Amino acid sequence: MDLNLRNAVIANVTGNNQDQLEHTIVDAIQSGEEKMLPGLGVLFEVLWQHASDSEKNEMLKTLEGGLKPAQ
């Protein structure tokens, strides 16, 4: 990912409150546009970098559960 894109995404949401961040995330997911994926990746990177070990484990469990094959 281009470093300028990462910085642009961070600059675009810096200072946003929780409602604004949620709107950004939900809008990106609901749009279904692949061009939104890098931005979500940057947000996940920030989340991961600021999470405790227990929060990281919880995220990994959630991801694992969400990615299990349908039975």
From Swiss-Prot:
Induction of the gene: Expressed only in the forespore compartment of sporulating cells.
One GO biological process term: asexual sporulation
InterPro entries named in the record: SspI
Stretch forming the signal peptide: none
UniProt-annotated location(s): Spore core
Keywords assigned by UniProt, alphabetized: Sporulation
Domain of life of the source: Bacteria
Similarity comment: Belongs to the SspI family.
Name of the protein in question: Small, acid-soluble spore protein I
Organism of origin: Bacillus velezensis (strain DSM 23117 / BGSC 10A6 / LMG 26770 / FZB42) (Bacillus amyloliquefaciens subsp. plantarum)
Gene: sspI
